[in-house]
């Protein structure tokens, strides 16, 4: 519910209940008088008592009061007693006690009732004050102010002066009797001679510019040397206030339960583990130990006793030798190192590592930076990490009997691990195989052999190396480096970038400008614990720090490499810079370079070193893996420990930033994925709709063609129908004519006369044509006879004249003879 309602401070409520109305005007109360407060005040005491039950049934967490200017209600802040956690009580019970006390004193029902006595209609508030000797001039002024405020009349000036006419017919307000006067601020007496405004002018402000002032007319006025005390009015009973609709709406928005204190407020107390990686790692290991069951804790305790026993046996073997060789002046290098070891300190570490870490973490860090003695390195590692347990031993034996799907990959990567002794190759395979079965989610990933090999070299049994690997993976957080998405590696790279930005902003900005990200060169640092580049002794020293401070110490080694090469890195461009980051970055800690710096012969040609890093780094890598003496391990570890300061609280801040960024990216990626899914769905729907549209379009075209054809058929049929109708009409007419003819007595009578004349003319013409035709035929016959006669005469002539006549040209003569015969007419019919 939104802020609303009003509050009565704790002290003011108790005073109102035990001492009367005057104690109710405390600084913590708030005025919530509604516009109909005057009408509420006219209710008699019997009606107030009748509604007391409804007032008591309201939420006990609300304490309502009012301030004179009628401001918006607010939530009641906890008082000092309520905010004190050790003395805090149930608020409901406390309020019930207050109500019981108020009911016993007769105060609760009468908070909003009229006072005993009366103010005569139109009378002055001073008259009412004169009726009660307890009430002074200040009380009378307050009554006048209450009456004026109830009516909503009077100018701001009159309200300040405490004058005004009382509402006609309104009963006077009764003040609760108190055993002793409460400590209330003094009230300003009404000045003599002040007159109230006429009734008709009440409610009209004197000036529009005073509206803002009217809202705060009850606040104390500040003048030179004077200060008006704040006077608060008494609200009506809650049951009366509930009748006002505006009050009820405001009450609905009130949050009845006080807001809880944020968790961060209770966790602001700093602890040593927030500023020390060693103590933080101790705390994490202790929490991991306490999270296990009793049987597992007993097994771990048994493992600790075995480790302490092994350490004691080792001390017994070296102490007699030290006594015998104490007088020998010349000792070999190994014996000299043994004499320099602070065995007393390491004994205290073995006996109680937690005490040493808490009380003397600085010395522990110094000793670890110098290196854990190699004779007891495995014991110290197992003691710090609580890794030795017969339960893990039994689990390891069981896992060895199960085949793994990663065996081929493990065999392939073991051949690349050159610093592992030959006799440890099979043990390394067994440990990696067992872990791939123990953690199927991780299985086996390239680079795990670089982490497991140093563990295996410093313990006596494979099961111990398996236990150390489990602790590094699960408890130290190395497992997250090898998960499919590598969340731990991504976080460490982000923390590395933030640390580099804080320690060397110039170098960080230079890399960012060139577009070089830490994932391009620092991934192998964290995955292999620098084992891919540094020799075995180097990796063992790094593991010493990791077991004591946690996997976070890798950030120190990564940052110190960047800081020491900053002068070279800021001068290189992209290609050479990336090559230098991958290979030439480690040349700073070559023993030769360290010796030159210590002798004051600093190598000034750093850029040349970066240019030849491609060729020289490869040879130095091979030499470091074989000899292990090229790098100065002590200087590297000490520089990282001393110059790079990292606190757990700082890393938690980076982690929170990364989680926030990752969450935003995850949400953005989820939105993108959701949009891609929706896009694919929409594309499928579009293709489906397009296919459906194509089918519908084809059907539409087919239907359109059919429609056109049908329309053509209809038109054709209509034409045929018309023709048939015409034919029917003609046939009908013929039929009617024939039927009419059959009904007539003489059929020829109906032949028209003109037709007969035409027929006669036609017959006459036909006769003429036939005559002409006969004549022509006769002529043709005559001509044919003439031709025959001529041919016969020619033949006779040629015989008579012989050869002479043969040479003469032939002359055709056509003799036309009249026709002997004549034409005759035949009757045509």
From Swiss-Prot:
Function summary: GTPase-activating protein which accelerates the GTP hydrolysis rate of several GTPases. Involved in ER to Golgi trafficking and polarized exocytosis.
Coiled-coil parts of chain: 279-341, 666-803
Biased composition (Low complexity): 101-115
One biological process term in Gene Ontology: endoplasmic reticulum to Golgi vesicle-mediated transport
InterPro entries according to UniProt: Rab-GAP-TBC_dom (IPR000195), Rab-GAP_TBC_sf (IPR035969), Rab_GAP_TBC_domain (IPR050302)
GO MF term list: GTPase activator activity
Record domain Rab-GAP TBC: where: 371-550
UniProt protein name: GTPase-activating protein GYP5
GO annotation, cellular component aspect: cellular bud neck; cellular bud tip; cytosol; Golgi-associated vesicle; incipient cellular bud site; mating projection tip; plasma membrane
Name of one Pfam family that matches: RabGap-TBC_2
Subcellular location: Cytoplasm
Predominant location category: cytoplasm
SUPFAM superfamilies attached to this UniProt entry: Ypt/Rab-GAP domain of gyp1p (SSF47923)
Ranges annotated as biased composition (Basic and acidic residues): 38-50, 142-151, 189-220, 800-811
Source species: Eremothecium gossypii (strain ATCC 10895 / CBS 109.51 / FGSC 9923 / NRRL Y-1056)
PROSITE patterns cross-referenced by the UniProt entry: TBC_RABGAP
Region (Disordered) location: 1-243, 600-620, 790-812
Top-level taxonomic group: Eukaryota
SMART domains xref list: TBC
């Amino acid at each position: 519910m939104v802020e609303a309602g009003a509050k009565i401070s704790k002290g003011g409520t108790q005073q109102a209940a035990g001492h009367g109305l005057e104690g109710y005007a405390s600084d913590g109360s708030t005025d919530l008088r509604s516009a109909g407060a005057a009408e509420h005040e006219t209710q008699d005491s019997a009606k107030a008592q009748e509604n007391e039950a409804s007032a008591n049934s309201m939420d006990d967490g609300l304490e309502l009061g009012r301030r004179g200017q009628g401001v918006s209600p607010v939530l009641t802040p906890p008082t000092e007693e309520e905010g004190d956690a050790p003395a805090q009580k149930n608020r409901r019970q406390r309020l019930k006690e207050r109500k019981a006390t108020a009911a016993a004193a007769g105060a609760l029902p009468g908070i909003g009732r009229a006072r005993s006595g009366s103010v005569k209609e139109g009378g002055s508030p001073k008259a009412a004050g004169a009726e009660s000797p307890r009430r002074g001039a200040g009380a009378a002024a307050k009554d006048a102010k209450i009456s004026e405020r109830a009516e909503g009349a009077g100018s701001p000036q009159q309200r300040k002066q405490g004058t005004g006419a009382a509402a006609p017919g309104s009963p006077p307000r009764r003040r609760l009797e108190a055993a002793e006067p409460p400590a209330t601020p003094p009230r300003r007496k009404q000045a003599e001679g002040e007159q109230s405004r006429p009734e008709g002018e009440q409610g009209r402000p004197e000036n529009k510019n005073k509206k803002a002032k009217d809202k705060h007319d009850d606040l104390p006025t500040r003048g030179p040397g004077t200060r008006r005390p704040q006077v608060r009015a008494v609200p009506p009973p809650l049951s009366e206030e509930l009748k006002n609709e505006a009050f009820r709406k405001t009450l609905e928005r009130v949050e009845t339960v006080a807001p809880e204190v944020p968790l961060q407020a209770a966790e602001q107390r700093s602890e040593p583990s927030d500023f020390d990686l060693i103590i933080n790692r101790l705390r994490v290991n202790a929490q991991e130990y306490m999270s296990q069951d009793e049987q597992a804790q007993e097994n771990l305790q048994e493992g600790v006793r075995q480790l302490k026993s092994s350490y004691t046996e080792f001390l017994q073997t070296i102490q007699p030798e030290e006594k015998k060789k104490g007088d020998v002046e010349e000792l070999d290098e190994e014996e000299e190192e043994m004499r320099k070891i602070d065995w007393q300190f390491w004994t205290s570490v073995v006996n109680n590592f937690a005490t040493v870490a808490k009380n003397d973490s600085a010395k522990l860090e110094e000793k670890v930076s110098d290196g854990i003695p190699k004779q007891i390195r495995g014991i110290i590692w197992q003691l710090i990490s609580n890794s030795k347990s017969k339960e893990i031993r039994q689990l390891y034996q069981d896992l060895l009997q199960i085949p793994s799907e990663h065996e081929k990959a493990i065999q392939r990567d073991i051949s690349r691990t050159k610093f592992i002794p030959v006799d440890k190759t099979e043990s390394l395979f067994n440990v990696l195989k067992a872990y791939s079965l123990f953690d199927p989610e991780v299985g086996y990933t390239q680079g795990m052999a670089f982490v497991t090999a140093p563990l295996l070299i410093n313990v006596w049994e494979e099961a111990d190396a398996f236990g150390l690997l489990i602790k590094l993976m699960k408890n130290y957080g190395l497992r997250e480096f090898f998960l499919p998405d590598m969340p731990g590696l991504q976080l460490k790279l982000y923390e590395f970038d933030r640390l580099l930005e804080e320690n060397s902003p110039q170098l960080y900005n230079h890399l960012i400008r060139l577009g070089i990200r830490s994932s391009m060169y620092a991934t192998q640092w964290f995955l292999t614990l620098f084992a891919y580049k540094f020799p075995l002794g180097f990796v063992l020293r790094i593991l010493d720090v990791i077991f004591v401070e946690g996997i976070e110490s890798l950030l120190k080694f990564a940052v110190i490499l960047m800081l020491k090469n900053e002068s070279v890195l800021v001068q290189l461009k992209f290609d050479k810079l990336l090559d230098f980051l991958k290979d030439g970055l480690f040349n700073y800690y070559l023993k030769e370079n360290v010796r030159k710096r210590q002798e004051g012969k600093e190598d000034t040609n750093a850029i040349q070193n970066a240019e030849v890093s491609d060729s020289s780094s490869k040879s130095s890598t091979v030499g470091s893996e074989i000899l292990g003496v090229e790098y100065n391990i002590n200087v590297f570890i000490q520089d990282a420990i001393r110059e790079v300061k990292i606190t757990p609280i700082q890393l938690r801040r980076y982690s929170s930033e990364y989680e926030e960024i990752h969450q935003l990216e995850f949400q953005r990626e989820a939105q993108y994925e959701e949009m891609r899914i929706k896009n694919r769905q929409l594309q499928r729907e579009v293709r489906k709709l397009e296919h459906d549209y194509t089918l519908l379009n084809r059907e539409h075209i087919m239907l359109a063609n059919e429609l056109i054809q049908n329309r053509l058929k209809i038109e054709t049929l209509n034409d045929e129908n018309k023709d048939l109708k015409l034919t029917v009409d003609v046939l009908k007419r013929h039929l009617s004519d024939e039927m009419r003819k059959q009904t007539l007595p003489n059929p020829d009578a109906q032949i028209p006369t003109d037709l007969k004349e035409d027929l006669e003319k036609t017959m006459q013409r036909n006769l003429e044509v036939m005559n002409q035709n006969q004549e022509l035929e006769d002529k043709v016959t005559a001509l044919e006879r003439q031709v025959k006669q001529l041919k016969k005469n020619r033949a006779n002539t040629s015989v008579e004249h012989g050869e002479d006549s043969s040479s003469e040209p032939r002359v055709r003569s056509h003799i036309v003879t009249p026709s002997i015969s004549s034409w005759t007419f035949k009757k045509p019919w």
